[in-house]
Amino acid sequence: MKFIFITGGVVSSLGKGITASSIGRLLKARGFKINMVKIDPYLQIDAGTMSPYEHGEVFVTDDGGETDLDLGNYERFVDIKLSANNNITTGKVYWSVLSKERRGDYLGKTVQVIPHITNEIKELIKSTGTNCDITIVEIGGTVGDIESLPFLEAIRQFKKDVGDNNVLYVHVSLLPYIKTAGEIKTKPTQHSVKELRGIGIQPNILVCRTEIPISEKTREKLALFCDVEKDAVIEAKDARTIYEVPLNLEREGIAKLIINKLKLNTNNSKPDLKEWRAMVDRIVNPLNEITIGIVGKYIMLKDAYTSITESLVHAGAKHDTKVNIEWISSEELRDETYKETMDKLVEDEKLDGILIPGGFGERGIDGKVNASKYARENNIPYLGICLGMQCAVIDFARNVCNLKGANSTEFDEGAPFPVIDYLPEQRDIEDKGGTMRLGEYKAILKEGSLAQKLYNEKEAFERHRHRYEVNPEYHDILTENGLIISGTSPDGKLAEFIELDTLTHPYFIATQAHPEFKSRPNKPHPLFDGLVKSALDKKLKK
């Protein structure tokens, strides 16, 4: 097996994850089996208990792993399914080592960072890629962070453990452009590489993030001072879309460098990127344009909704349509003035569809319920996800079924009509971490329903992350008043999908699941595809 390690320097949020994903895409396009790993040097076991403001989106895997959002990019770019094991945290490493110590596995030896922590890191990395040709590992954070040192030491040791021809180091760094001087500065990258070399890691490839093209002189300077080949200084200029990055890196020759350094055997030196290029072309050269309003409580940090926004991009690309996003704070829709706010957005052509994503807690919940009501009453295409489905049910119960005060017990334990309540198995759970209904579950779709037509299947398999459900005691009154429960768990007890009749509303559907985690650039998720198509049809009819 071959290993590629991606590190970052100078500043965070440089795009290490997109770089790793793009390399994975290029190598898969040449026929290699790819495995991806993200290392996060924080002390949590996983990302499940972290605030979206701290961490961004929690990406859920099929097996129920609550992971870093970069795993979402890996899955989307490389079109693979990952597991909880593909996200390694400091907490997970120490938990494993300390558990072994308590069991006596170390036979009385002094347990230390080296070799015990570093050995554990190496074993965890190796265990994820047993059925692949290449494992790509992204080290979170920036070179120089104290939290990253054990991981950097572990990947340094890999070269000795598995051989020089089986390990490659890629360093992603920033080349700041000073406008007043009119030049790119290489010194921060030089210092970053010096720091990395001080740990014992010599990068094989430099990926240089830049606003403007890199001159030959700059490449030569970086090659000299960072001790890499000139053709291994890769320009990573700002792209029009993240999906353009693999194409840019391919033009820079990064895949050929990797193949040569790792001595990879390939019968396909030219990658199959035809469909990918066509998809990128549709994104950057759209024929149409729509705006979807996302009503959320974490809109100050867009990373909290990464998979949702990317799913809209995928669906838009299929329909040659640019999907603009109007970010709407749910707290601004709490009172009756919400109608004026929404009317103004419609008037300004900024509301061709409404999407309410998942979330937790009471803050802003009334605004989400009002947004669902507005979509229902004004025939605006609507997609509700997780909490977005629960809000649609609360609105329907209050305003159609006339169950005044209907609510979720998450927000009002004494609600007169608890139309949303704990899942039975969740009621007595006190721990927060890893205890929700997590991972992939099957739903049976109602024949002839909108959900069934969108999926074009009798069953749907989606990922979940929730503690609450539509209270089964209220299924009958909801359906008697016109709500369609169009998908349920195999035993028929848990409502997985709800919708309105397409004769009364063009597109109103919601799911307890998180469909955004399964959308792919060349295979948009059916629910997002339906939302974009309905919103586009509505706009073109005006």
Curated annotation (Swiss-Prot):
Name under which the protein is recorded: CTP synthase
Enzyme Commission number: 6.3.4.2
GO CC terms of this entry: cytosol
Residue positions binding L-glutamine: Y53, G359, L387, G388, M389, Q390, E410, R467
Gene (name only): pyrG
Activity regulation comment: Allosterically activated by GTP, when glutamine is the substrate; GTP has no effect on the reaction when ammonia is the substrate. The allosteric effector GTP functions by stabilizing the protein conformation that binds the tetrahedral intermediate(s) formed during glutamine hydrolysis. Inhibited by the product CTP, via allosteric rather than competitive inhibition.
This protein's record includes keyword Nucleotide-binding: yes
Keyword set includes Cytoplasm: no
HAMAP family xref list: PyrG
Assembly and interaction partners: Homotetramer.
